[in-house]
Amino acid sequence: MTSFITAVDNEEPTFNLTNSRLRLVSGTSNPKLAEEIASYLGIENVPLVSKRFADGELYVQIQQSIRGCDVFLIQPTCAPVNDSLMELMIMVDACKRASARQITAVIPYFGYARADRKTSGRESITAKLTANLLEKSGVDRVLAMDLHSAQIQGYFDIPCDHIYGSPVLIDYLESLKLEEVVVVSPDVGGVARARAFAKLMSDAPLAIIDKRRSAHNIAESLTVIGEVKGKTAILIDDMIDTGGTICSGANLLKKEGAKRIFACASHAVFSPPSYERLSSKDLFEQVIVTNSIPVIDNYEFPQLKVLSVANMLGEAIWRIHEESSVSSMFR
């Protein structure tokens, strides 16, 4: 499996894009990630003006010609979610009206992904609505990373390439030379994700935390299924939001005798009170996330490790542009 652990930052471009029609455009959600992707591809992002009017309306203008180009719009729909999503759709419309040949929305973090089904009557399936809105805005293709559930890929009636942050996380974990590893799913719903992660980690054993959620953002861990005593436990999830699920799981693992505890997630949503929960010195040895969502400075703490997914996204963008396989990146 190709290593995607760090972003390339060298003088020589990785690809020959001298006469290419590939163009990168970054929204305001994660410009640093977009810069790293551009560095990997050896090109520069197309300049963009994005501003807000006094009444809160957004304005976007592409600052150079993209006529006939293969345009990739880089925009995680993270907080502020509604503004990020609306800005992305306005960017798409601007590219469409500027005669771009193809428009791909690169969405490292897909907001509203947790609203992927109805759990009670009279609820919206907002993940499907979001997919519909993106399609109607004029997107030709979507490139997403670690969707909350695989079924969201099927919400789109256009091509949707789904890639995974696990190679980046596993490259880093393997560099730590950990021993007696057990991969732990923080809830029953994440078992498939944890099983796939464990298989990639030299077929490590799997444990599951049986948990019941009494209300939104309130999590209660009950018991551990599997052996964790004396082992290095790696809690794996797609995202860390308030930190309730993963921290309650870690507390239970500690009570059950786990020797070391690492938390891993692709998306650092980090809503309050996640900082207070995750920065506890006696809970996690490390909290490992990717830069799919920018981590604001005042949320950094000693145990936090942020890994770049720029190489992986850049490679996927190049393969889409060249009409070659994306799935083979993960074989």
Swiss-Prot record:
Kindly list the places in or outside the cell where this protein is found, as annotated in its UniProt entry: Cytoplasm
Which residues make up the binding site for ATP?
A: 55-57
Per its UniProt record, what InterPro entries does this chain match?
Answer: PRib_PP_synth_CS (IPR000842), Pribosyltran_N (IPR029099), PRibTrfase_dom (IPR000836), PRTase-like (IPR029057), Rib-P_diPkinase (IPR005946), Rib-P_diPkinase_bac (IPR037515)
Record flagged with keyword ATP-binding: yes
- EC number(s) given by UniProt: 2.7.6.1
Give the first-level EC class, as a single word.
transferase
What Pfam family is a match, any one? Pribosyltran_N
Q: Which CDD domains match?
A: PRTases_typeI
Active site, per annotation: 211
Q: How is the cofactor bound?
A: Binds 2 Mg(2+) ions per subunit.
As one GO molecular function, the record gives: ribose phosphate diphosphokinase activity
The UniProt record gives the binding positions of Mg(2+) 1 as 148
**Binding residues for D-ribose 5-phosphate, per the UniProt record?**
213, 237, 241-245
Where is Mg(2+) 2 bound in this sequence? 187
Gene Ontology, cellular component aspect? cytoplasm; ribose phosphate diphosphokinase complex
Q: Which cofactor does it need?
A: Mg(2+)
Which reactions does this protein catalyse? Answer: D-ribose 5-phosphate + ATP = 5-phospho-alpha-D-ribose 1-diphosphate + AMP + H(+)
Kindly report the protein's main subcellular placement as a broad class.
cytoplasm
- Keywords of the record: ATP-binding, Cytoplasm, Kinase, Magnesium, Metal-binding, Nucleotide biosynthesis, Nucleotide-binding, Transferase
ATP-binding as UniProt keyword:
yes
**NCBIfam families xref list:** PRK01259.1, PRK02812.1, ribP_PPkin
Tell me, in a sentence or two, what this protein's role is. Answer: Involved in the biosynthesis of the central metabolite phospho-alpha-D-ribosyl-1-pyrophosphate (PRPP) via the transfer of pyrophosphoryl group from ATP to 1-hydroxyl of ribose-5-phosphate (Rib-5-P).
Question: Can you state the subunit structure given in the record?
Answer: Homohexamer.
Family, per entry = Belongs to the ribose-phosphate pyrophosphokinase family. Class I subfamily.
What the entry lists under HAMAP family is as follows:
RibP_PPkinase_B
Q: What is this protein called?
A: Ribose-phosphate pyrophosphokinase
